Amino acid sequence: MGRIEKSIEIGAPPEKVWELLALDRLPEWMDVLEMKSGKYISEVHTPKDKYKVGATAHIVEKRWEYDLDISESLENEMITVHSKGKYPYTITCTLKPVDDGTKLMYTSDYESKGILGKAFGKLFAGTLEKQVERALEKLKSILEK
């Protein structure tokens, strides 16, 4: 099991950062996953439904497709999503108000299956961390425009 932990301060209030944590908004900034699209497959009747526990989206990436579901959610404070598929991972984003905006703390736990998967996981851990840093910088850039 691998883990990535990163944080960034964003010059926007937690409510604005929260909006971009919706599963269908991840492709706008999360290049690390090479997402092409994200569409809710659970019922979404109101904007708040996008963040409720049990909400599920189908994600299409460059190399594969899978579903993401929300397992924890506290509006404008914390959200945890879990992937169901070939390469399982869990991402938790925690938001804390700071003087000039929001501190976002990103944690990802991912599983590399099999002997080759574990070997590649160790080799690419640094690359994954850099991709997460780039994604967080892109999120910051979008929100600070």
Kindly give the residue locations of the regions a language model identified.
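Glycine-rich portal/gate segments that line the openings of hydrophobic small-molecule binding cavities
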Residues: 39-85, 134, 138-145
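Beta-strand/loop substructures that line and gate deep hydrophobic ligand-binding cavities in soluble
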Residues: 82-134
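A short, structured loop/turn motif at beta-sheet edges
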Residues: 13-15, 71-76, 94-103, 141-145
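Hydrophobic pocket/interface hotspot
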Residues: 17-21, 26, 57, 70, ...
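Hydrophobic ligand-binding cavity/cleft-lining segments
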Residues: 1-48
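Short, surface-exposed coil-to-beta transition loops
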Residues: 3-5, 64-68, 88-92
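Hydrophobic residues positioned within well-ordered beta-strands of beta-sheet architectures
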Residues: 4-6, 55-57, 91, 104-106
